[in-house]
């Protein structure tokens, strides 16, 4: 469950995100999995409250999972890598507060107007790059409990819109509001140092792939409806 859904129902969010993660570790313990790779989030950096970045229930749950993983390793020798993806974009990334750049690309492909409700520097982590990082991680042999940031490319929302409009000059996509309340420029190097040099996508490559995918689905009559709510 992502940020808005955890905010709407914190108890359910905790059951899904925290208890659900514990269940994964318990199953690993029972059947003897060699390692676990799980998704944390950059939202965990909002803890403890009162710091530079926004605190959320979702971030609390993700930080709890990171500490849970450390204890499973210390007490039961279950190795794990927790990956904190920053702002993932690409086909089907259509829910959560950080999905708005994907929705903007979809809106352009479907000839719809859309205003991204934030601006400024932003992490652009293409879904293909995020998937590669997880695949490389689960293929790596290791014995400890690690947590790594996964940032992708740091670029402004405004420049992302410019790339989109180079593909479709008549696109009715804008941005407004404040800067996004999470760090846009974390380092991927510690993760790459452990697991190897997984594929990287530039912002331009990711936007082009995403836009063309939405266009293809539109032509096939299979493009999902635009989610302008959550």
Predicted regions and their residues:
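Active-site segment of SDR-like NAD(P)-dependent oxidoreductases
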Residues: 1-4, 42-49, 86-89
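NAD(P)H-binding glycine-rich loop region in Rossmannoid oxidoreductase-like domains
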Residues: 1-16
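Short-chain dehydrogenase/reductase
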Residues: 12-14, 18, 54-66, 94, ...
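Conserved Rossmann-fold NAD(P)-dependent oxidoreductase catalytic core, especially the SDR/UDP-sugar
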Residues: 15, 19-59
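NAD(P)-dependent short-chain dehydrogenase/reductase
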Residues: 57, 70-122, 129
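C-terminal substrate-binding subdomain of Rossmann-fold SDR/epimerase-dehydratase oxidoreductases
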Residues: 117-120, 124-230
């Amino acid at each position: 469950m992502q940020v808005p859904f955890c905010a709407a129902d914190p108890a359910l969010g905790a059951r899904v995100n925290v208890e659900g993660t514990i269940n994964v570790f318990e199953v690993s313990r029972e059947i003897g999995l060699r390692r676990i790779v799980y998704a944390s989030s950059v939202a965990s950096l909002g803890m403890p409250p009162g710091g530079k970045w926004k605190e959320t229930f979702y971030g609390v749950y993700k930080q709890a999972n990171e500490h849970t993983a450390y204890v499973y390793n210390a007490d039961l020798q279950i190795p794990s890598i927790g990956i904190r993806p920053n702002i993932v974009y690409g086909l089907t990334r259509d829910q959560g507060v950080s999905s708005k750049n994907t929705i903007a690309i979809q809106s352009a492909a479907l000839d719809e107007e859309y205003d991204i409700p934030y601006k400024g520097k932003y992490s652009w982590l293409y879904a293909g790059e995020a998937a590669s990082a997880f695949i490389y991680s689960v293929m790596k042999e290791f014995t400890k409990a690690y947590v790594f940031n996964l940032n992708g490319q740091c670029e402004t929302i405004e420049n992302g819109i410019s790339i989109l409009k180079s593909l479709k000059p008549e696109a009715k996509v804008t941005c407004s509001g404040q800067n996004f309340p999470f760090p846009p420029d974390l380092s991927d190097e510690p993760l790459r140092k452990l697991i190897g040099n997984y594929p990287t996508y530039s912002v331009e490559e990711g936007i082009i792939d995403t836009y063309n995918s939405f266009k293809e689905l539109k032509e096939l009559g299979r493009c999902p409806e635009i989610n302008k709510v959550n």
